[in-house]
Amino acid sequence: MRLSAFIAALLMMFALAPAQAVPKDWNRVVAATPAGGYLIGNPAAPVKVVEYFSLTCPHCRHFVETGLAPLRGNYIAKGKVSLELRNFVLNGPDLSASILMTCGSPALAVHLYDAVYADQEKLFAGAFSLKQDALDRIQAAPLEAKPGVFAHEAGIDAWFAAHGLPPKQAAACLADPKRQQRLIDLRAEAIEKQNVQGTPTFVVNGTAVSGTGWEDLEPAIKTALGGG
């Protein structure tokens, strides 16, 4: 057999071999939701988890550090569970940071969610120790400009710029009163519809979970999947 014929035969064998299906990692699927959140995972997942979070919340950071990896690896990746992230603003630094987190694409928002908790103490260190002259500038700013002035004085805008959010885009979002109001409305809706009182609050298929940790959330997920 000629070499050219041999190579052609080999290529034909590869062409006829059944393709090995690569399992889809649903963690790569991110979309904005009508409720104002960000959905990670299979939109048709049988179990839907909603997390109400605050970017300044240490208990939220603890969940991210201890529970997010198993949630993503064992449940979201396989299409069994989806996770919707919804902001629940608690304070001024949180409002400024939440405006910036939600300023770009859904994928960027999820990236920033992860990044904030990985660097939470450093990010907000200046926000809670502002000097009087900085506080005076914030106080003197018009109401709609306060989140932007606060972000600048506390270095929050610089942190987000270093993590992928273009400064001009950030400035436009901080100055947009509709974005500010939407986050305030999200908080009000969470209180009214789900009786959210603090963060993190988890809701599994419409039912609130008692507790704030992975040790509380995973049993609720297993029960919803039929294995609890």
Spell out what each predicted region is:
Residues 2-95, 187-188, 192-193, 226-228:
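Extracytoplasmic thiol/disulfide redox context detector
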Residues 3-5, 21-23, 54, 146-228:
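C-terminal cap of thioredoxin/glutaredoxin-like
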Residues 15-16, 71-73, 78, 96, ...:
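Alpha-helix boundary/interfacial micro-motifs
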Residues 17, 120-123, 181-182:
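A short hydrophobic/aromatic micro-motif that marks alpha-helical segments and, especially, helix-coil
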Residues 25-27, 103, 173:
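Functionally engaged cysteine thiol sites
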Residues 25-27, 123, 214:
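Tryptophan-centered motif/residue detector
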Residues 41-44, 59-63, 88-92, 101-104, ...:
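Extracytoplasmic/periplasmic, Sec-exported soluble proteins
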Residues 55, 62-147, 153:
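Structural alpha/beta surface segment adjacent to cysteine/selenocysteine redox centers
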